[in-house]
Amino acid sequence: MSGSLWMLIGALVLGTVTAAWWYSGRQGGSMGETVKRLDRAHPVGAVDRDKRQEEAIQLHPNAPGIGPGLSIGALGEHGDRRLYQGWRECSVHVWGTGRGKTTSQVVRHAAEAPGAFLMTSNKVDGVTEVIAARRDRGRVWVFDPQRILDEAGEPTMTIDLFASVEDTRTADEVAAIFESASAGAAGASGRDPQFDSQGRDLLSACILAAAEDGREPATILEWITSGKLRDPETVLREHGHTGRAAMLRGISQQPDDTRGSVFATAQRMASALSHDALVRWATPTTGVRRFDPGAFVDSDDTLILLAQDTAGSGAAFVSTVLHTVFTAAQKSARRNGGRLRVPLVADLDEVGNVVKLPALAEWYSYFGSMGIVVSAFFQTKGQGVTMLRHTGWETLWSAAAVRVYGGGVDDDKFLEQLSKVTGKYDHRTQSYSTSRGGGRSTSVQTQQREILPVDKLAALPPGRAWVRTNKGGGTIVRTLGWFADPPLAAWINEGLDEMKEVD
C-alpha cells in the first residue's frame, strides 16, 4: 500500500475519531446539547433570515432584490435556517488551514453580494469559482502582477495606485502601508527606529507630490534615490502644501549622515516601486483597461487582488489598491447621505498572507454603518497580531459585529478567550446513599462547567464554526460549502465549464 494512501486513511480515521469525540456524551455532552446550552445562554434569533431581510430593505431601499445578508452557516443539525452577517456589519474570522473558509464563505459571499464584490488571495483556490458565480454581473477585474492565476503576466488592467491620495492624511495612510510591508520584509535587523518616522514622512511627501502633479509611481522612487527634493518641494508649494514642502526643505538641510539615513529608510519603504513588473500594473497602457475605483464601488463589478508575499512588494501594491477602493467607497457613501446605495462586499481572504493595512481596525469601527461590508480571514490570531500589533488586533476583534472561529487552531490563549465569552452552564449530578436501616436518600450537586472548553474548541469538527455576534448571540453553525448547495453548485459548475471551453 502506498504512503499517500496510508496518509489518506490516517486522515479519515482522525476525522472520524474527532467527530465521534465531539458528538459523544463526554466532555460536556453532545453537539446538540452544546448548541442548546449556547442558545439558552446567548440566543441568536436577532440574526435570522426574516429579521435580516427586513433590516436589509430598511438600510438599502434603493437596492432592488437585496438579500438578507451574507451566509455564515446554518443553524441546527438539519434544515437551511441560516445565520447571516447583515449589511451594516463587518466580520473577523480565524480558520485553520484546510477548514473550508474559501468554499463556505468567500465563494458564497461572492454569489450573495448585491453590488460590487472584491476579494484578496494568495492562491488560485476559489478564484475561478468566484468568477463563475458572478459571470452574470458586471466586469471582472483581476490584479495579478505576480502571475498567480495567469502565467503570461501581462497586465489585464492598470490602476492609478495613488488615486486615494488627495491630502496629507491620505498620503500618510498610504506611506504607512508601504512602511508596514517593507518592515516585515526587512526584519528587525533592517530597521532603524530613529529614522523610521522621518523616512515615512519623506515618502508620504513624495507620494503626495506625485499624486497632485499626476506623476507615475516610478517618479517617487527617482526622487528618493536621487536625494534631490527640489522638484517635489516645488510641486507641494504650488498645490498649497506648504507644511510638507517646508519639511522636505528641512530634510535637505540636515547633516549628511542624518540625511543619508533618512533617505535610506525612505528608499527601503518605497522598495516595492523598484519592481518594474508591478509598476506596469500601475502605469497607463494603450489597449489595457484602466480601473476606476469610484466607478467600481457603485457598480456590480468584481475585483480580485492576488499577491503572495505577505511582507514585501506584492502586499504593498494590493494593500494600496484596497486603500483606493475603500476611500472611493467612503466618498460615495457620503454623497448618498452616509451610506452606499448598494453594499460593497469585501472578503479579504488570506488577509494575513496578502494584506498590510494598519488602518483596518479603525475602519471596522464605522465601515459597516456606511454599507462597506468587510470580512477579514486570518489563519491564526498570531497573523492578526503581526499585522496590527496586539492592540490593533484586540480593537479589530472587538469592533467586528460578527466573530467566527472555523476550527483547526491550537492557540490555547485564543481558545480560552472564546471559551470564556461562551460562558458556563450548571451541570447537575445526583448521588444516592442507603442507610443501615435500608433507607435511601438522594442528593443533587451543581457544578459550573464551560459550555465549550478549550479542548472541545480545538477539536471542532470540519464543517462546523463557532460564531458570536455583537448582539450577544453565539452558537455553533454548520458551514455551507457552495458545492453542497445544488442550485449554487449547478450555476458555478456551468460557469466553470464555460470557462474551460473558452480556454
Report the location of each language-model feature.
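Basic- and hydrophobic-enriched, low-structure N-terminal and domain-boundary segments
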Residues: M1-R99, T103-Q105, A152, S435, ...
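Short intrinsically disordered, low-complexity coil segments enriched in acidic
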Residues: S2-L5, Q417, T475
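Glycine-centered flexibility motif
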Residues: G73-G76, A116, G214, T380, ...
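P-loop NTPase motor domains
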Residues: W87-R88, V92-I372, S443, Q447, ...
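Conserved ATP-driven motor cores of ASCE-family P-loop NTPases powering translocation/secretion/packaging/pilus
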Residues: Y364-K471
